[in-house]
A protein has these predicted regions:
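C-terminal reverse transcriptase regions that engage the nucleic-acid substrate
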Residues: 54-172
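Two-metal-ion RNase H-like nuclease active-site motif
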Residues: 176-190
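Acidic carboxylate-rich catalytic motifs and surrounding loops in phosphoryl-/glycosyl-chemistry enzymes
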Residues: 35-61, 65, 295-308, 312, ...
Length: 373
């Protein structure tokens, strides 16, 4: 058995406690890995002890990441981040001239390092779908200026890496847990709708709906976007509604339910292999997760027959005559009678703003956006 790194985390109240834990730790290591006739080397590296790696400190470098034990944050080691930024910036500069390309081996190596770096920035994984597609194709040379989606992904990766030193990731943002809030969504060729409720945190039970624009409907019927793309856009709609309804989502746990299996898989991995449209939507969702400092979301599949609560708001636009609601008051009346809440509580209708609808529609139609949006 070979142990590469051993980490001891202590919350001491005195220096004596640190000495006690240090002695116990080193004794335990020698007991488990004693020097013998076969291997006379000491199990604890003298070289690393001289480098002070064995000293307790509030800040430590472990496996390429800097950990701050007081602030409970982590970030990529400065030298590694600087190297990645230098390479990525050189790629972007070369792409502006439209001449030089990136050797595939170099591209593959840097993307692997980026994937490791995004251990501390989980939302960064949502930017790598265009990179993953290029890795599958394995061209001898990668040209960013010929692939604007890939070029945009590299540019945003630079932004996340650059900001990570000024705003390190809180360790709590890396841990999944039981949801504080739950959102359920469904999308059809007519529109999208969903509900938001609180689980461990208080939240006004909310329902929302939105009819797709003529441009989106035309893109769907012409085959440029798929039903799964609409479902993915629906989850992005749902998230933006939750930002408004649930308040501060920093370090909160959120579960998102959908009856579309591909969408659930994409959100779980923050990546898609096939759909370029959904890759664009995942990128938008990932950036919103980063802006909000939310814990990893929990995407869950719900069977279509059990998702009747969101069938209504996603099909209120004439496809189902019995569900036709011309006003929010009609929707509220229908929802309260069909899905009554306990203690005579009432649902609330969230009116989507043009800002939110324009955001999602733009992303769905492959128009560009920024981190702040």
């Amino acid at each position: 058995v070979y142990v590469d790194d051993f980490v001891s985390l202590v919350i001491p109240t005195s220096r004596e406690q640190l000495r006690h834990v240090s002695t116990g730790t080193m004794t335990g290591i020698h007991d488990v890995f004693p020097a013998d006739d076969i291997d006379s080397n000491d199990p604890i590296s003298e070289k690393k002890l001289k480098q002070l790696d064995g000293e307790y400190a509030p800040t430590k470098t472990i496996l390429g990441f800097e950990f701050d034990g007081l602030a409970k944050t982590l970030w990529l080691e400065d030298a590694k981040r600087a190297h990645l930024l230098t390479v990525l910036h050189s790629w972007l500069r070369s792409s502006r001239t439209g001449k030089a390309g990136i050797p595939f081996k170099e591209f593959e190596s840097i993307i692997a390092k980026l994937r490791h770096a995004f251990t501390a920035i989980p939302a960064g994984r949502g930017l790598l779908s265009p990179c993953n597609k290029m890795l599958q194709m394995k061209p001898p040379v990668v040209y960013l200026h010929r692939n604007v989606v890939l070029q945009a992904a590299v540019a945003v990766c630079c932004t996340l890496l650059r900001e990570s030193s000024d705003a390190p990731t809180r360790c709590r943002e890396l841990v999944s847990g039981w949801p504080d809030y739950i959102g359920v969504c469904d999308a059809s060729s007519h529109g999208v709708g969903g509900v938001v409720v609180g689980e461990t945190e208080a939240c006004t039970p909310t329902v929302f709906r939105w009819e797709w624009s003529a441009e989106v409907k035309e893109a769907y019927h012409s085959g440029r976007i798929t039903n799964s793309d609409l479902e993915m856009a629906g989850l992005l709609f749902l998230w933006l509604v939750m930002e408004s309804v649930c308040g501060n989502l920093r370090e909160k746990h959120v579960a998102l339910f959908s009856d579309n299996s591909p969408t659930v898989s994409w959100v779980c991995r923050l990546a898609t292999r096939g759909s370029l449209v959904s890759a664009h939507l995942i990128r938008a969702l990932a950036l919103r997760l980063k802006v909000n400092g939310t814990c990893p979301i929990t995407p869950l599949h719900i069977a279509g027959e059990e998702n009747s609560m969101t069938d209504i708001p996603s099909r209120l636009f004439g496809s189902e005559p019995q569900w036709l609601c011309k006003t929010n008051h009609d929707l509220l009346t229908l929802f309260n009678s069909t899905f009554p809440l306990p203690n005579q509580s009432s649902w609330t209708v969230f009116q989507l703003s043009s800002k939110i609808s324009t955001r999602v529609t733009s992303v769905l139609l492959m128009k560009d956006f920024t981190l702040d949006e």
